[in-house]
Every structure is written in structure tokens, then in C-alpha cells.
Amino acid sequence: MNSERTAEAIPHADPLSIFESWFAEARASEPNDPNAMALATATAEGVPSVRMVLLKGHGPDGFVFYTNLQSRKGGELAANHHVALLFHWKSLRRQIRIEGTIAKVTPAEADAYFASRHPESRLGSAASDQSRPLPDRQTYLDRVDALRAQYPDGNVPRPAHWSGYRVTPSAIEFWQDRDFRLHERRRFLADGQGGWTSTLLYP
């Protein structure tokens, strides 16, 4: 039997450690935005929506992203705390699926991240009524210009409607592309005691 064909590419290990290893490889391999991830949310009635966002922090306590709390996603997150994330790194032929629940980051965390952003990005976020109807693009640009005039030093304060969420994972699934679609999948489930159970899945 071909040992290379039967060897498992996804280790029996702490899934957060595997994520850290794969994410490091993605940062070295992906040409654009290796921290881009699909975020799936749903209404209280279960109507789903999905969009790309950027991972801005991760560790033992979860995965962090930031957004406008008054956007469509913000409304859905307020109504339904269950979410799913998906990373797809085409250059590595890998993907990671994460399921879990969200909680807001602390105001201090949100302030620190907002202050770290480029001044133009801060202006754009402060001026945007995200997901609401916009009569024309010039209206948005005029709002950005007005804020730029109000804060010529670029120190735009974080709007109250802009913050971040931390996803606490309950399930993490790793997928590795293999030849002839004989892919490899391993799913980890949180055991409720700080550990994980691991299962190899049919592709």
C-alpha cells in the first residue's frame, strides 16, 4: 500500500494549534488577504446570509472580527448568536470551517483596534451607514470629506455603532485537497471541558 497515499495530512492535535500552523503557511503563500474569511449569519427565523470579512485576532479564546453593529450582519448577530466561518486558501488547497457563538469584544479592545487603522479607513467606517440605502456614491464621499474636515489630525474617535465580535468555536473542521478528490477531512468538537474530540470524516 502506498504510504504517501494513506498518510494523514491533518494531525491528531489541538485544533487551535493546527489552525495557527495552517494560518502561518497561508500568510506566506496566499497573494492577497490570507485572513479573509466567509462569515455566515442568520436571522432569528433562520434566514441565512454570508459575506467576506477579515480575521483581526485569534487565540485560545476565539476568532475576532470587526464590523458596523447597525449593518445587516450586526442586526443578525444581535438576534442570533450562532455563526459559521470559512477560510479557503486556494494556494494551499485547504479550507477550515468553524462553527460557534459570538460575543462582543470589550470597548477597550475595540478602541485599540480602531485606533490602529489607517485614518482614511477610520473616516470611511465612521461615515458609513452600512447596509442602508445610499442615493449615490457622492453622498458617502461628502460625508467622509466632512469628517476629514472635522478631524484634520486624523484622530477620528470610534463610533458607538462600530465594534468587534469574538467567535468561541464549538466545532472546527479541516479539509485538505488530495488527488482524484480523495480529500481528507477531520472534525474537532469541543467537549465542554476545555478539550476536543476528533473524528476523521469521509470527504
Curated annotation (Swiss-Prot):
UniProt-annotated binding residues for FMN: 51-56, 66-67, 72-73, 95, 130-131, 175, 185
Cofactor or coenzyme needed: FMN
EC primary class: oxidoreductase
Keywords: Flavoprotein, FMN, Oxidoreductase, Pyridoxine biosynthesis
Domain of life assignment: Bacteria
UniProt keyword Oxidoreductase present: yes
One Gene Ontology term of the molecular function aspect: FMN binding
Pathway(s) per entry: Cofactor metabolism; pyridoxal 5'-phosphate salvage; pyridoxal 5'-phosphate from pyridoxamine 5'-phosphate: step 1/1; Cofactor metabolism; pyridoxal 5'-phosphate salvage; pyridoxal 5'-phosphate from pyridoxine 5'-phosphate: step 1/1
Record's catalysed reaction(s): pyridoxamine 5'-phosphate + O2 + H2O = pyridoxal 5'-phosphate + H2O2 + NH4(+); pyridoxine 5'-phosphate + O2 = pyridoxal 5'-phosphate + H2O2
InterPro entries noted in UniProt: Pyridox_Oxase (IPR000659), Pyridox_Oxase_CS (IPR019740), Pyridox_Oxase_N (IPR011576), Pyridoxamine_oxidase_dimer_C (IPR019576), Split_barrel_FMN-bd (IPR012349)
EC number from the UniProt entry: 1.4.3.5
UniProt cross-references to Pfam families, sorted A to Z: PNP_phzG_C, PNPOx_N
Binding positions for substrate per the UniProt entry: 56, 113, 117, 121, 181-183
GO biological process per UniProt: pyridoxine biosynthetic process
Cofactor note: Binds 1 FMN per subunit.
Matches recorded under PANTHER family: PYRIDOXINE-5'-PHOSPHATE OXIDASE (PTHR10851:SF0), PYRIDOXINE-5-PHOSPHATE OXIDASE (PTHR10851)
Function field: Catalyzes the oxidation of either pyridoxine 5'-phosphate (PNP) or pyridoxamine 5'-phosphate (PMP) into pyridoxal 5'-phosphate (PLP).
Family, per entry: Belongs to the pyridoxamine 5'-phosphate oxidase family.
Quaternary structure (record): Homodimer.
Name of the protein in its database record: Pyridoxine/pyridoxamine 5'-phosphate oxidase
Taxonomic source organism: Novosphingobium aromaticivorans (strain ATCC 700278 / DSM 12444 / CCUG 56034 / CIP 105152 / NBRC 16084 / F199)
Lineage: Bacteria, Pseudomonadati, Pseudomonadota, Alphaproteobacteria, Sphingomonadales
Gene designation: pdxH
